């Protein structure tokens, strides 16, 4: 874990347990982000919170620190059994749950508190075995948590802290009935520490908060701009004929360390994967059809650097929290302007610089005015020289291939199809309009 401090407030300034401060220090956390600096004084005073904060603002560490500190300060109920968690953290997607659990386990190092994670798509019995041994903090997606509650594997009758992360996404994905089902099986809201975080505090999110929380205090970190100043945006107007060649040329020139390519359909993503794989790139594919185990493996490879380019649909990419993404390519402009913000928000996080490149092709160019109205600025336009685009593109690879393996980037692997195995990239010869 790492983060760039965005406030002058330090974690050491708060009355945190020594075990938590030790874990924070060991993992490079000294200064708080604004959402942490504003929410921790409330939470450490055992008051509920409804926080508005975008992804990448440090909200995960805010609620994890508060949860661990609360459990260390408040004794566990004497009648509690091993199969009765003390805290529950609900996330809309498997990937977000996995990331939260990863950070939670780092914080748990000196506390003696056990962290467990459950989500669909993985072995029911394997996850149950962890629950049978007992966990203090349960992290997971609502559907799998409900499965274990209904089967009597766990009970929520002694929950002392609750976190609902990305509540707006919960509504988008239709999980609100599940959430209310789980809340009804917990102790009264006044006997718990309740935390809700959402990118937007819409009326429906606030209604959920007030129905199941104890007079939560609202904390809002509203960005002045919907897109970060750390992200350099640009847009091209390619013909349908040039579109694939332009993408491959840009990637060859930019040579991104870690890039995500977004497209609007599964079919288009599969086509992109085929051409990128055929061109020698280390590429992964995420669509709704990718099995969960393979999905996790691809994300691990992307995070570790074994894969350089990830091709994804919006649905498949929801909940992804991957650091150090240098480039985002919008092969198709999204139909939903909010998806544009979510897409490019994968880069330029935690104070880092990022690059977002979008294509306004004949099929999706009509989406641009609404996007620019929503983000309240025009996206700078770049031109390209058609004659400078790559013209020696190998045939696309077949979609059914073994998972990518680590390969070197020098001659004989990536770029080996070019004359002499030269890995230098041809100039793009692009110019900007005034």
UniProtKB/Swiss-Prot annotation:
GO biological process: RNA catabolic process
Catalytic activity as recorded in UniProt: ATP + H2O = ADP + phosphate + H(+)
InterPro entries on file: DEAD/DEAH_box_helicase_dom, DEAD_box_RNA_helicase, Helicase_ATP-bd, Helicase_C-like, P-loop_NTPase, RNA-helicase_DEAD-box_CS, RNA_helicase_ATP-dep_RhlB, RNA_helicase_DEAD_Q_motif
Enzyme Commission designation: 3.6.4.13
Keyword Disulfide bond listed: no
Assembly description: Component of the RNA degradosome, which is a multiprotein complex involved in RNA processing and mRNA degradation.
Gene symbol of the encoding locus: rhlB
Domain Helicase ATP-binding, residue spans: 40-219
Job of this protein: DEAD-box RNA helicase involved in RNA degradation. Has RNA-dependent ATPase activity and unwinds double-stranded RNA.
Lineage: Bacteria, Pseudomonadati, Pseudomonadota, Gammaproteobacteria, Alteromonadales
Subcellular location: Cytoplasm
SUPFAM superfamilies associated with the record: P-loop containing nucleoside triphosphate hydrolases
GO CC field: cytosol
Species in which this protein is naturally found: Shewanella frigidimarina (strain NCIMB 400)
Name of the featured protein: ATP-dependent RNA helicase RhlB
NCBIfam families: PRK04837.1 (NF003419)
